[in-house]
């Protein structure tokens, strides 16, 4: 059995010699479990359309990642130093260039004059942290870097946001893409609409127009700014996306649901 997430099939699948090896491995697999339609598509590109593939997305603990009550939301905002009436965007990830936080910072700076209550919190660490902080300082953007967020804090950080955003983008001619984006399903489980960049499996994680928005060109500051402003301006749309996000998390990403799916696959393979 082979399990695929993203880069381990995308990169060798695009290089002639390694593609031959990958194709042989995939064709000889008793079954293939893919984390989304993106790695499944990449596998078919390398090994053919007849591969035995089942898509089982990454899971989320829907009891731990849950919507906050109004009081919990206020308390959580105060924990992170955010005012009750702020328009809060939260981004959580390993900080590397393809995650697109530089674009989010530029968007926050561009919108700040017309939206003085806008606040962006970025949680996570990584090699891009220093560059991002310099960009924040240069632009005077209403963005605060939180550094590493503990597992205990994470659900509250998502839950107190109006929108969660990670503008993931493809790099190196498509060799570097987003495999899935577990941060999107965590935010969804908290009932928070998500904004994703169109890259790899992000469109599997975020249903465009239903649980959030997928930006076609995540490096286009104007396009992203329009998307952000649209969601922040429309509280009713956000409430619809909140409900849809939570329902999808319970029905699609919950560990109990995924365990049953995996058990069915293993039962078939074991016969």
Located regions from the model:
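Carbohydrate-associated surface elements
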Residues: 38, 59
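Conserved donor-binding/catalytic core segment of Leloir-type glycosyltransferases
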Residues: 83-99, 105-109, 121
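Nucleotide-activated donor-binding/catalytic signature segment of Leloir-type glycosyltransferases, i.e.
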Residues: 130-155, 163
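Short hydrophobic beta-strand element within catalytic cores of glycosyltransferases
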Residues: 184-189, 193-196, 206
